[in-house]
Curated annotation (Swiss-Prot):
Part of the 50S ribosomal subunit. PANTHER family: LARGE RIBOSOMAL SUBUNIT PROTEIN UL30M, MITOCHONDRIAL RIBOSOMAL PROTEIN L30. InterPro entries: Ribo_uL30_ferredoxin-like_sf, Ribosomal_uL30_bac-type, Ribosomal_uL30_ferredoxin-like. This is Large ribosomal subunit protein uL30. Keywords: Ribonucleoprotein, Ribosomal protein. Belongs to the universal ribosomal protein uL30 family. The keyword Disulfide bond does not apply. One of its GO terms (cellular component) is cytosolic large ribosomal subunit. It comes from Clostridium kluyveri (strain ATCC 8527 / DSM 555 / NBRC 12016 / NCIMB 10680 / K1). Pfam families: Ribosomal_L30 (PF00327).
Length: 59
C-alpha cells in the first residue's frame, strides 16, 4: 500500500472538539508537524473530515 505524508498547516484553536480529536488521533499536535500513515479507508476518512487543516502528499 502507498503511504501518505500528512502535515498540519492550520491551528486547532477554536475548532470543533471532534475535529481536534481527529487531528490528535492522526498524531498531529503542532503546526508544521509531519506524520506518515498507510493509505487505508480509515485514514482517508479522517483526512477528509479535517482536510481544511491539513496538507497531504503521497510518498
Amino acid at each position: 500500500m502507498a503511504k501518505l505524508k500528512i502535515t498540519l498547516k492550520k491551528s486547532l484553536i477554536g475548532r470543533k472538539k471532534d475535529h481536534i480529536a481527529t487531528v490528535n488521533a492522526l498524531g498531529l499536535k503542532k503546526i508544521g508537524k509531519v506524520v506518515e500513515h498507510e493509505d487505508n479507508p480509515q485514514i482517508k476518512g479522517m483526512i477528509k473530515k479535517v482536510s481544511y487543516l491539513l496538507e497531504v502528499e503521497e510518498v
